[in-house]
A protein has these predicted regions:
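Pan-zinc metallopeptidase signature
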Residues: 1-2, 9, 171-172
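Acidic/histidine-rich, surface-exposed loop or edge segments in extracytoplasmic proteins
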Residues: 12-39
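Solvent-exposed loop/turn segments at secondary-structure junctions
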Residues: 77-80, 98-101, 126, 133-134, ...
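Short pre-active-site segment immediately N-terminal to the catalytic Zn-binding motif
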Residues: 98-119, 134-143
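Active-site recognition of the HExxH zinc-binding catalytic motif
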Residues: 117-130, 148-152
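Post-HExxH zinc-binding segment in Zn-dependent metallohydrolases
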Residues: 131, 138-171
Length: 172
């Protein structure tokens, strides 16, 4: 379910880890566009991390995957975004090429919606628990289905998708 303001309020002081924002391509159009919609990346990432935590967990006493360091980068790469790292040291990149594609019609609202949705998805990977005893992300479709399904569910629960955003059929 979507996190409500009461549940979200209990997470405001929860430590989400040391957030390091790095723009690896400040000269790119995608970077310039990003900076127009997100003026304080560290605070924005922290706010969205609290939303993810409030959606994934009932309380701060739950068994929560710790995040000590979160290195978030803007990079000139194909694709959209990805999370890597382990043991509380997490990195997430966001593609400036994707930012440019998402802003193709100069629609700031659409871009902000997409940027938030992508961030909710990737932050879910940072804070979610992983299934045990069924392999890993690369070797198990069941593992991937759990991980990606949960991230999409958190995004959807927080109004991060429109009905037309998800292709029908296929496998993810």
């Amino acid at each position: 379910p979507e996190c409500d303001s009461l549940n979200l309020a209990q997470w405001e002081d929860y430590p989400v880890g040391n957030i390091l924002f790095e723009d690896k391509v400040p000269e790119s159009q995608g970077s310039k566009i990003y900076k127009r919609i997100i003026d304080n990346p560290q605070n924005y990432i922290k706010e969205q991390a609290h939303t993810v935590l409030a959606t994934l967990y009932n309380s701060k006493q739950d068994s929560i995957a710790p995040v000590y360091n979160l290195h978030y980068t803007l990079e000139n790469v194909e694709g959209v975004s990805a999370k890597g790292g382990e043991n509380g040291n997490i990195y997430i990149y966001y593609s400036t090429q994707h930012i440019e594609r998402s802003f193709a019609n100069n629609d700031t609202t659409k871009l902000f919606f997409e940027t938030r949705g992508v961030l909710l998805h990737e932050l879910t990977h940072a804070y979610q628990l992983e299934p045990q005893g069924i392999g890993d992300y690369m070797s198990s479709e069941v593992f991937r289905a759990f991980i990606e399904g949960m991230a999409d569910a958190v995004r959807a629960a927080n109004n991060g998708f429109t009905p037309s955003d998800r292709p029908k059929g296929g496998s993810y």
